[in-house]
Regions:
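N-terminal binding-site loop/beta-alpha segment at the start of enzyme catalytic domains
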Residues: 1-73, 194, 275
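Acidic-and-aromatic substrate-binding clefts and catalytic sites of carbohydrate-active enzymes
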Residues: 22-26, 46-54, 82-87, 115-118, ...
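Short, acidic/polar
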Residues: 23-36, 85-100, 147-150, 171-172
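Residues at the N-termini of beta-strands
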Residues: 42, 104-107, 138, 162
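Short, well-ordered amphipathic alpha-helices
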Residues: 53-64, 93-97, 127, 149
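A short, structured active-site edge motif that brings together acidic residues
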Residues: 69-83, 107-113, 167
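CE4/NodB-like, metal-dependent polysaccharide N-deacetylase domain
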Residues: 89-110, 129-133, 185
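Beta/alpha (TIM)-barrel catalytic core signal, keyed to glycine-rich beta->alpha loops juxtaposed to Asp/Glu
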Residues: 113-277
Length: 277
């Protein structure tokens, strides 16, 4: 398992299981449990996904079936708009912990920047409070553009360790990627397979055939070779297993360049500059 190291010295697995649009049901629990059994050590959820209870149940089931300890897992959740504001962050964090059945998170993210800079900065100060009080291992952001981060970094004392954003071969986020690298902020992809749309791309399919791998494995490997943390979502056991098996091959420079050339600046999610929930 490859890991990324944050500027604070902590590490995060480079691949994890995403749970966006996964219902809060037994299917969710089983997929999290299965992922842990297959070797996943990072699980990503969020308050707004509405599935923290079953993600937590899957984590507990995974502990039971594998014998691994809590410190072997890296668990992420996220703060949503209704809990913005420094005074609301601690209660929102504790509520997520309660739903998950955990004592701490490895990573807590501000889910979106919103359109009010003062509120964004105030909210981040609540995140800093959690970190300074040793409630959470790492704090970060999601869907932040360079201008959001510039505004934030000018007014706070602790820098986010990570920025989880939409990133796939049709949205390569070149400017943002360079900015994050310069700031020593890790980049993470929340939609690496573009809701499966990218899997039908002819270039991706050609490269998959060249390597004897699946299109999904090619795209996830492209993420990893670009130094991006990636969290593909699936509830299908064979796909969960397949998505994890990306460390036994490499894309050539020529193959990487071909995939890089697919960029269309095409989003499947909201525009971070205007989205308000």
């Amino acid at each position: 398992m490859e890991v990324k190291t944050f500027y604070n010295g902590n590490t995060m697995p480079q691949i994890g299981l995403g749970t966006f649009r996964v219902e809060n049901d037994e299917n969710c629990m089983e997929s999290v449990k299965y992922a842990i059994e297959q070797g996943y050590r990072s699980i990503d959820t969020a308050k707004v996904y509405g599935n923290e209870e079953q993600v937590g149940a899957g984590i507990r089931a995974g502990f039971e079936s594998t014998g691994i300890a809590r410190e072997d897992l890296f668990i992420t959740s996220k703060l949503y708009f209704e809990d913005f504001g420094r005074e609301n962050v601690a209660a929102a964090y504790e509520a997520s912990l309660s739903r998950l059945g955990l004592k701490y998170l490895d990573l807590y993210l501000v889910h979106w920047p919103g359109t009010n800079e003062a509120v964004m900065v105030d909210t981040w100060k609540g995140m800093e409070d959690l970190y300074k009080n040793n409630k959470v291992k790492n704090i970060g952001v999601s869907n932040f553009e360079p201008e959001h981060l510039e505004a934030l970094l000018a007014q706070v004392s602790i820098k986010p360790v990570i920025n989880q954003v939409e990133y796939h071969p049709y949205l390569t986020q070149h400017k943002l990627k360079l900015y994050l690298a310069a700031q020593h902020i890790v980049m993470e992809s929340w939609s690496p397979l573009m809701n499966a749309q990218i899997l039908n791309d002819e270039t991706i399919k050609d490269i998959a055939q060249e390597l004897g791998k699946s299109p999904a494995q090619v795209v996830l490997r492209w993420n990893v070779q670009h130094g991006v943390v990636t969290i593909p979502k699936s509830v299908t056991p064979n796909r969960i297993s397949e998505n994890f098996r990306i460390f036994d091959f490499e894309l050539s420079d020529e193959q990487m360049t071909r995939i890089d050339g697919l960029n269309q600046d095409k989003r499947i999610g909201p525009d971070p500059k205007t989205f308000e929930g």
